[in-house]
Amino acid sequence: MDNREQAAVVARAANNGDATIAVSLGEPSMEPEVWRKDIRRAKERIGRGQILIVSVIGTPVPGGDAETLIADYADCAGWAAESGADAIEVHLATPDPFVEQTQMIYENVPLAARILHRTRTTVTVPVLAKLGPFKTPRLLHETATRLAAWAHGYVLVHSISRRVFDDKGAPAFDGAGRERADVVGAQTFTVASRQVAEMLAWRKAGAWDRAVLAVGGISTVERARDVLREGADAVLVATAALYDPLFAARFRQIRTAAVA
């Protein structure tokens, strides 16, 4: 994928370590009882020293207001914690359904704060706020500062929103409202790692002491090591694991060998 400033052009081939994909799936979910069972099964299978972070998102309903959405976030978080989650990731990098002009929930700081507050007062496990990219370092600082009271840490960057076209210049996804999609994978690293570095710089300056979990374009072990050396508390991968399910195992092997 050729990832440009305002658009991305889809390519059909990808090699391990450089895969970048566009995602336009909406926000589908199985019924709560189904994914609660998945969480329990996952918790039973994790090993010593591992933790299970469960990401939750509220579902807007036709005619629903902010309170309805906030309550759904909290309900999902409570069910996830009851099912065995060691930490809750509150997914705020999703469209804000209460505004006409496109923005994400994390950009609506009062709404994001209410969601985090309700979640934090619902569960006893750590709460992480998942964020997307910010237009300026100042916006990042102001948002993180205002949300810090209700979050144990931040996870960023979820994805990069772009208009996506095929190699003939036509929209890559059929249907109204799908001109823009979430771009994830290797080529988002430049943007995502810069956002993480800015978050770490504000923390080092004493703005707040919350954990910073890096995600976005971390497609190689070398990138993971670099981000951790910069000060991130943890590295998360998603697209990389689709192409390399043993990514984490290889990371641990290389780190162990380096120490030895």
Kindly give the residue locations of the regions a language model identified.
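C-terminal helical cap(s) of enzyme catalytic domains, especially alpha/beta-barrels
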Residues: M1-R12, V164-A181, L228-R229, A234, ...
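Catalytic cores of alpha/beta
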Residues: T68-A71, D75, K135-A149, A201-A205, ...
